[in-house]
Each structure stands twice: as structure tokens, then as C-alpha cells.
A protein has these predicted regions:
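Cytosolic regulatory regions built on CNB/CRP/Popeye-like sensor folds
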Residues: 1-201, 206, 210-221, 227-235
Length: 235
């Protein structure tokens, strides 16, 4: 049966042992489909039904640069004092972007999750003067490509394409960082914690408290008190 006419549903697992002729068996999509879908969303290019269009071929060329990598929680991906080497497309999991002081103190700047693409936004991070680190918060499935090859492929596709692509993430990170700093200086910690619960419920469920505390700008003991106080109000 042509996939166009196949319902996009699957039968309940409890029916699978019955060998019922009405059971709908869905073919598992290859891993590369997740990569192509992710690139399609990031670049705003529709692939299905447009496979021969130049933009679709561009995505296919980009996809060839990536390989899949599965990592455990707390796997270091990029480290300070070394040029940032790769671009990452997150299929599953959460990554954190942070700086680490010589005394070991951590300052978390950003979290990235499913569907996000992570790469060295700042020119300095592509040199040995890099001060940023990237580590997995949870087990993660990633698509990884060499950053220089990735940038070169985009630049060769059209003049001005790389600056417009790069600007989107740069602006997003700058806006989120400035807003977080503004809140840190103008709002008490309980209000900032409440906004964290409202705006990032998925992070609160999946990211360890000590990392959320650093992102919120409080010490772990304060974060624990905020968490206990908020839970008491809800009960």
C-alpha cells in the first residue's frame, strides 16, 4: 500500500499477540530521517514532495556531514581553552552551555534540548581562547558534524546565507541572556523561581537541581528552599 494512503496511526500493543489482520504495522523510519527532519525545521525548508528542489538537495548535502553519537549524562562535548570543533543537532536529550572558573565554580548560561542546533556562535569560542564548555545533562542522542565543514557548506550554497543563519541563534542567546541578567538584578529569587516553573517546566523535570540553581543565579541550598517553599504553596 502506498504510504500516502496509510493512516498515520498504530495499533495498540495489546493487539500485537493476536496476529489480527486489522493490525496496522508501521515501518520504522531510518535514523537519517530524524536528521533530515531536524535540518528541514531549522532551515525552514520543506523536503517531502520537493526532493529535487535545490534547497532539498542542499539539506541532503548537509546531512552527509553528520554522524550519530549517543552519550551518557555528564559527557563533555566541548571544553574551554580548546577551539570549539563541532556542530550538534539534538535528537534526544539536554545539553548545557557553561563557564567554569579556575576554582571550579560553574556558571550555566543556556540549556539546549530536542530539535536545537548548537554551534560556536562567538568567534572567540573557535580559538584556544574559548571560555565555554558544553556537556550533556542527560543521556543524549546527537547528530555531530565538523563545524568548519558545516559552515563552508552553507556559505557555498549562497551569498549571505551563513550570516542570516548565524544571526538567528546569536540574537536568541543574547536576548535570553540579557533577560535573565535583568531578572537577576531586579527580581527576588522566589519570583525568578516561579518564572522558571512556568516557562521551563520540562527543564525542571529533567535537569538536576544544582544546574538549575546555577542558571537561576542562586546557590543550591537556596534553590532547595525555593523548591520546598513552592511545593508547600501548591499542596
Amino acid at each position: 500500500m502506498n504510504s500516502i494512503f496509510r493512516p498515520n496511526v498504530s495499533s495498540a500493543p495489546c493487539m500485537l499477540g493476536e496476529d489480527n489482520p486489522d493490525i496496522i504495522h508501521q515501518d520504522a523510519a531510518p535514523a537519517s530521517t530524524a536528521l533530515l527532519n531536524g535540518l528541514s525545521r531549522i532551515f525552514g525548508i520543506r523536503v517531502e514532495g520537493h526532493e529535487n528542489d535545490p534547497d532539498a538537495r542542499f539539506l541532503a548535502d548537509l546531512a552527509r556531514l553528520f554522524h550519530q553519537r549517543r552519550v551518557d549524562a555528564e559527557t563533555g562535548l566541548e571544553k574551554h581553552d580548546s577551539p570549539w570543533a563541532n556542530v550538534y543537532l539534538i535528537q534526544h536529550g539536554i545539553l548545557r552551555l557553561f563557564r567554569e572558573a579556575p576554582n571550579g565554580k560553574i556558571s550555566v548560561h543556556h540549556f539546549f534540548s530536542e530539535g536545537d542546533m548548537v554551534w560556536p556562535v562567538f568567534g572567540r569560542s573557535r580559538t584556544v581562547r574559548n571560555t565555554l564548555c558544553l556537556t550533556s545533562c542527560t543521556p543524549a542522542t546527537l547528530w555531530v558534524a565538523d563545524f568548519a565543514a558545516f559552515r563552508s557548506a552553507i556559505q557555498s550554497h549562497g551569498e549571505g546565507l551563513w550570516p542570516s543563519f548565524a544571526l538567528a541563534l546569536t540574537e536568541e542567546m543574547a536576548e535570553l541572556t540579557s533577560m535573565r541578567e535583568f531578572r537577576k538584578h531586579t527580581m527576588p529569587a522566589p519570583e525568578r523561581y516561579q518564572l522558571l516553573l512556568e516557562e521551563y517546566p520540562e527543564l525542571v523535570r529533567r535537569v538536576p537541581d544544582n544546574q538549575l540553581a546555577s542558571w537561576l543565579g542562586v546557590v543550591p541550598a537556596t534553590f532547595s528552599r525555593l523548591k520546598t517553599g513552592a511545593a508547600g504553596k501548591r499542596s
